[in-house]
């Protein structure tokens, strides 16, 4: 139990530092029942971990968890390279310099999974090896060996 508590404290510290570099953009609609399930979890990212959350309504509605929500004024198209938001709820993370953005989740996703994705996306480039070294997409993966034991 102590090890788990220590790991949770470290995760909170890591996410707290990521919240200084990254913000979140949350897309929703009022008539979306999944959005009503996901919204309180997204709010926890703000209250518990310090992430700035910009809530964007695709239908102009106001969300009870995000009364300061904004209408979509093109940010959805910007984050999706012109495709627009196809499914809600959708959560993106955007770095403070606005040079990078990543889709964190689409649909209802557990808070623990969202936190893991934020931690991973905030510290690794997509396609980068989780074990250090070269990108997995550029390296033949030796199936007979354990990647954790490679030198």
Give, region by region, the residue ranges found by the protein language model.
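N-terminal leader/targeting and pre-domain segments
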Residues: 1-19, 116, 122-128, 132-134
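Short active-site neighborhood of thiol/selenol oxidoreductases, capturing the structured segment around
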Residues: 16-32
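Thiol-based oxidoreductase modules, predominantly thioredoxin-like and allied folds used
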Residues: 27, 50-75
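Solvent-exposed loop/turn segments at secondary-structure junctions
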Residues: 29-34, 59-62, 99
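C-type cytochrome heme c attachment motif
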Residues: 30-37, 90-92
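Typically the conserved alpha-helix immediately C-terminal to a functionally engaged Cys/Sec
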Residues: 34-50
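Short, internal strand/loop/helix patches
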Residues: 67-97
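Non-catalytic, surface beta->alpha helical segment in thiol-disulfide oxidoreductase systems
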Residues: 85-86, 93-150
